[in-house]
Amino acid sequence: MEYIYAALLLNSANKEVTEEAVKAVLVAGGIEANDARVKALVAALEGVDIAEAIAKAAIAPVAAAAPVAAAAAPAEVKKEEKKEDTTAAAAAGLGALFM
């Protein structure tokens, strides 16, 4: 993710996304840059209008938000069941201290 963030930072600063620029941003952030990843990122972004891609991506989550919310309800039930098991196990563990 750091590599993508570096490219986004360069784009927002109106700088060209080059291997050297991405490496400089990563090093400034205290991250050791992997040359292969940097080259792959720059190659993947070649010819891509980042601002346009962000605008298109910003629209997509809005349409998908409703199904995700509907799917979240069953996940909450599972979490509650796990909490009950954890509580029972913790109570059993505490009971063992007094035996």
From Swiss-Prot:
Parts forming coiled coils: none
Pfam short name (any one): Ribosomal_60s
GO cellular component, one term: ribonucleoprotein complex
UniProt-recorded Gene Ontology molecular function terms: structural constituent of ribosome
Keywords tagged on the record: Ribonucleoprotein, Ribosomal protein
GO biological process: one example: translational elongation
InterPro entries found in the cross-reference section: P1/P2_N_sf (IPR038716), Ribosomal_P1/P2 (IPR027534), Ribosomal_P1_arc (IPR022295)
Family from the record: Belongs to the eukaryotic ribosomal protein P1/P2 family.
Protein role: Forms part of the ribosomal stalk, playing a central role in the interaction of the ribosome with GTP-bound translation factors.
Assembly, per entry: Part of the 50S ribosomal subunit. Homodimer, it forms part of the ribosomal stalk which helps the ribosome interact with GTP-bound translation factors. Forms both a pentameric uL10/P0(P1)2(P1)2 and heptameric uL10/P0(P1)2(P1)2(P1)2 complex, where uL10/P0 forms an elongated spine to which the P1 dimers bind in a sequential fashion. The proportion of heptameric complexes increases during cell growth.
Name the record gives this protein: Large ribosomal subunit protein P1
Organism in which the protein naturally occurs: Methanococcus vannielii
